[in-house]
Amino acid sequence: MAEFEVERVGGELKRFGVEGPDVPFKVVSPYEPAGSQPKAIESLVQGVRDGDRYQVLLGVTGSGKTFTMAKTIEALGKPTLVMAPNKTLAAQLASELKEFFPNNAVVYFVSYYDYYQPEAYVPQSDTYIEKDSSINEEVEMLRHQATASLLSRRDVIVVASVSCIYGIGSPEDYAGLAPNVDKKVPLERDDFIHALIDIQYDRNDYDLARGTFRVRGDVVDVYPPYAEHPLRFEFFGDEVELIAEIDEVTGEMLREYEAIPVWPASHYVTEKPKVKAALKSISEECEKRVAELKATDKLLEAQRLQQRTDYDLEMLETMGFCNGIENYSRHLDGRKPGEPPFTLIDYFPKDMLCIIDESHVTVPQIRGMHEGDRSRKVTLVEHGFRLPSALDNRPLRFDEFEARIPQFIYVSATPGDYELRVSQNDVEQIIRPTGLLDPKIDVRPVRGQIDDLEDEIRERVARKERVLVTTLTKRMAEDLTDHLLDAGIKVNYMHSDTATMDRVEILRTLREGKIDVLVGINLLREGLDLPEVSLVAILDADKEGFLRNRRSLIQTIGRAARNADGEVIMYADVVTDSMREAIDETQRRREIQMAYNEEHGIVPKTVRKAINDISSFIAEAEKTVGSKGRSKGDSLGHGAFYTPDESGEGGVPETVAPEQTLAEQLEELPHDELVRIVETMEEDMRNASAAMDFEEAARLRDAVVQIRAMLEGASEDETIERLRSQARTGSTFASGRKRQGARFKK
């Protein structure tokens, strides 16, 4: 068995034993660069080659920024990290780049939590909240594909959210412990089995699932977590006679290999000597910290810390895992106090390129991750729930993130002040090859806005076009959705409480025409590619603030720029400075495009794109993953070092099948089971309220209301409530609140 030789040379991870030559990046597209694209591509490529560390691509909506990214990556040939501000945009980018690079590795890396409750302590009520989570196996598979691809080839594009700045374990251990099975190299079957166990594969001779292997005589079947199909290894003595990919159901051989690496079943694997050293250093830190607490007369905290740490050490020594093992990551990695964790970025070669999409949102997001994570853990440390080393289980600080990336390209229609300040090369991409103009903008009074909006919506629906409506709050979005439903309009809403994969599905239903209107807040701004949308309505446009500043308004206006009949209506009583600046900038871009169209004889026409998204990735994953979501304990081999990448992104567990609503699933349950569920949820609701987790309490309250309505029989509003539930298909808990009319100015 040839193991991977791993070493750091000048900061770069060197890998050996990977079979096959490098494949160059190759864009497959019927189109050639046009409009502003050729100059933008040339300038960006030259900037990278000249050594410019920071560049900005100011590209308007619909100008083909993704195509420009693809052609730039093709010309440079560098492994590339593409970062997006949320999972929805990451999904869209991954899908588009996969179309451009069908013969290269385009992989998706986001937080794999469907639900995540972090460990926390509330001193005011003396309440300790244990960590709880539910993991999406399809997304976990895609994460493993990302790291496996990075260690196997150079033609890799990873599309990621800020999850990529959170710790996932050492790449040296991950690559160094992976067995490289080669027919030419002697290998005993038992040695191979022991190697699989060391990299956290579980033996299961009856049910071959991801992360497991089975043994039948001299045949060992392994199902890597990153693979679409299991691998079969046939032995004869110390010879490997067959290495093949097989169909997991029929056992049919799909492809044969001469050699292949088997990457670990977990991103966090570690050598036994490191574990022993970690046990010693954890014990020493505990002894020191307990003495500090006793010296300040914090006897309860000292006793609590000693008891918890002793238990964790015993579990680590005997079982190899413990609850909350991620809090000991610094010791297990062998890092010094304050040193940053290993992240996905450490799996990239030294000459990587980083493209940050919608940089005006993503950059501040990266900046804020560290402090938000630290504030919660400081409380745990101060009250004796965790050792101080738990603070080193954290995301990267912004300066640490920048230090790991050799070159950046910031992409946005409205770059932030930081990007513009550090940029060494500003590139504008204003002209759209399609000739599409920025939308016309109409400012209308607030009085009568809802009646006016209904009329505009019905006009678009008659033309089989779609409408986006942006509000300022979640409550306003939900109330407006209910009002439009009552008016007979097919509508849904989307905000931060909407589960991640549900967002993708909701956008898909909008494009397919299953709904005509989508109501949202800031999720309807950056990057959404919706050519069917011909109208964007901005309510309360004159309310200055984060959601109605110049950048936000320009981004929102851009959602109507992919349709030849695009129009924006701002409902406002006064024209604010932000509104005026956004309107003027839109008009400037519109005039540039009109001049280009006139010069080249172009007639603007809406480009109808195929309705693709990350669900294509998920569909492939679902072929081999049975469960939609699962709870997972913390262990050395089971993803213990992951933390959610976006505040509020976790949502609730996706346990409802996509084709079945919550109401349909509940209707299949017996009456007694529904009563038990309600009682349990009411208790959880009270506990959440006592812990001051009011958002969780409100979510549970809405679910209780919905189920109780089913138990007590349908009300006179049964039809409306059923419509509301169907409109929220895919969300684990649809809103159960009964609205008493829409609270808007009529």
Name each region found by the language model.
Residues 8-58:
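Conserved pre-motif I regulatory segment
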Residues 50-73:
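Walker A/P-loop
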Residues 63, 88, 523:
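ATP-binding Walker
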Residues 171-176, 471-501, 706, 710:
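Conserved helicase motor "Helicase C" RecA-like lobe of SF1/SF2 P-loop NTPases
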Residues 478-479, 492, 498-521:
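Conserved helicase ATPase core of P-loop NTP-dependent helicases/translocases
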